[in-house]
Structure formats: C-alpha cells, structure tokens
C-alpha cells in the first residue's frame, strides 16, 4: 500500500513532474547560457509526462510481479470474486476521463499545466457534485488544504531562491562546476554520484526541498556535459519517488503508520518496503543503461 500509493509521483499527471519540469527548464536555460547558446530550448512538463510513461509502467509491472510471487509463497491475499462490474465501471469512468482530458491536453500542447490544473479542479468539483458528495464544508476544507500546501511550496521556493542567490554570489556554482570537471571517469561518474547523493538526501529531506535546493545546483553542470534534459529529469524523478519509501523520514511510511493496525510494528513496515525500493533502483539502473526508453 505504501509503495503503490507513491506511484502517482512518477506516473502522469504528477505534481513532482510538474515541479521538476520548471526546475529542469531553468537549469537547462542556465546551462545553455553558460555554453553561449542564446537560441535556447526549454523543457516542458509535457515532455516529462511522456518520458515518464515507460518507466512508470515498468515500475508498476515490477510491483505486480513481486506481489504475485510473494503471495504464492505466503498467501497474504485472499482470492475474491469481483461482483458489480457495472458499478465499478461507473465509479472509475468519470475520474479516468478527467485524467485523460487533463493529461492529454498537456501532452498535446493544447493547454499549459496551470490551465489543465484549473480544468481538472473544476471537473473534480463537477464529479463530486454529481456523486452527491460536494458540500460547502468539503469545499472549505479542500480550499484550506490547497492553500496550506501552496503556501508550503512557495515558502520553500522563496527560501531556495535566496539560498541559490547567495550561493552563486559567493561563487559556489563555479566550485560545483569545477568539482564535476575534476571527477575521474567522466560525466557518467558525475551522474552516478549525483543520483546516489539525491537518493541519500531522500532519507532525510522532502522531495520538494530536494527539487528546489539540490537539483538547481547540480543539474546545470550535468546538462553542460551533454546529458539530455528530459532523460536526466526522469532519472531524478524516479530517484525522488524512492525518497517517499526510505526510512526514517519516508512520508509514505508515515502515512501508512498512521492508518495501519497497532499490531503492525514500524520496523515491519520498514522491512516490507525494501523489495519495492530495490525494484525502483533496478528500474532506475535500466533507464540509465537504456536511455532510448525515454528519448
């Protein structure tokens, strides 16, 4: 449950990819400026959405295979017959249609992520109204939650911008560039070092903090080495998703601990997610070795 609940961080439409798209676009423009390229290209959120489809499907497939294998050995899940297919379809069709419209409009270039998000919010409100679950109290609580999350993100963004400005002012970005250039083994050693660093930071930091503080510092030097921005963005997105499962501060683990039975120990939750972390790291390695899956 904890692992599959975090698939939304890599499978479009994903808030992590939306945030990462903005960060990678800025990093790519900065890298092009440093290389003297003034007819610049950008990285769109739609590009990341398209690039994340194959890795997302691979992660889901890996989860399914592992779940089937472990269930056959220990028989965790009882077999139940599915009844009421029409009711299931009726429940799934409206949100699936809304996701298709929102995601399709971004990938097709019809709407920006902000415009598509507005359509998605309005569509979700209509669906809630048709289901009879919409009321003023729910709307108030939802608006408050959205405002809280938005405030948190912008607070981190403002702090990260100040940090980045000071860091560049004292020449920190030049130091990072020099460190990358002096690394033995070339650009792939630098890439593996950064991916490992992001993975370790995921044990203690939220993905938003990594996205706005760490990635803007390390992405431009990597892009100047010739890496494709979309491919690099997907690698970092998979890495960021893994941070939700890494103890002790994996947010997915906290959520599961809050709703799980008291008889389930925290250490058992930590042990249970290890195979899923390994699956994600294997998929990450495959994307590194076979970039054509993204490009």
Regions found by a protein language model. Give the residues of each.
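Alpha-helical transmembrane segments of multi-pass membrane transport proteins
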Residues: 1-295
């Amino acid at each position: 449950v904890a692992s599959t609940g975090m698939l939304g961080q890599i499978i479009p439409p994903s808030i992590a990819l939306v945030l990462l798209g903005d960060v990678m676009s800025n990093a790519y423009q900065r890298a092009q400026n440093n290389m003297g390229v003034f007819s610049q290209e950008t990285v769109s959120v739609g590009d990341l959405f398209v690039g994340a489809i194959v890795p997302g499907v691979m992660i889901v497939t890996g989860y399914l295979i592992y779940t089937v294998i472990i269930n056959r050995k220990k028989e965790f899940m009882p077999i139940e017959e599915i009844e009421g297919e029409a009711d299931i379809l009726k429940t799934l069709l409206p949100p699936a249609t809304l996701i298709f419209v929102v995601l399709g409009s971004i990938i097709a270039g019809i709407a920006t992520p902000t415009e598509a998000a507005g359509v998605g919010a309005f569509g979700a409100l209509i669906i809630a109204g048709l289901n009879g679950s919409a009321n003023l109290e729910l709307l108030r609580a939802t608006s408050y939650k959205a405002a809280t999350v938005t405030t948190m993100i912008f607070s981190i963004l403002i702090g990260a911008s100040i940090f980045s400005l000071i860091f560049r002012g004292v020449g920190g970005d030049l130091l990072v560039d020099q460190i990358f250039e002096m690394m033995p083994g070339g650009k792939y050693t630098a890439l593996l070092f950064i991916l490992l660093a992001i993975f370790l930071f995921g044990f203690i930091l939220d993905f938003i903090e990594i996205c706005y503080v760490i990635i803007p510092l390390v992405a431009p030097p990597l892009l100047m080495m010739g890496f494709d921005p979309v491919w690099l963005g997907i690698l970092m997105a998979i890495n960021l998703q893994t941070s939700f499962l890494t103890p002790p501060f994996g947010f997915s683990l906290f959520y599961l601990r809050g709703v799980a039975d008291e008889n389930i120990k925290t250490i058992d939750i930590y042990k249970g997610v290890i195979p899923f972390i390994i699956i994600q790291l294997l998929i990450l390695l495959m994307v590194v070795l076979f970039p054509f899956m993204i490009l």
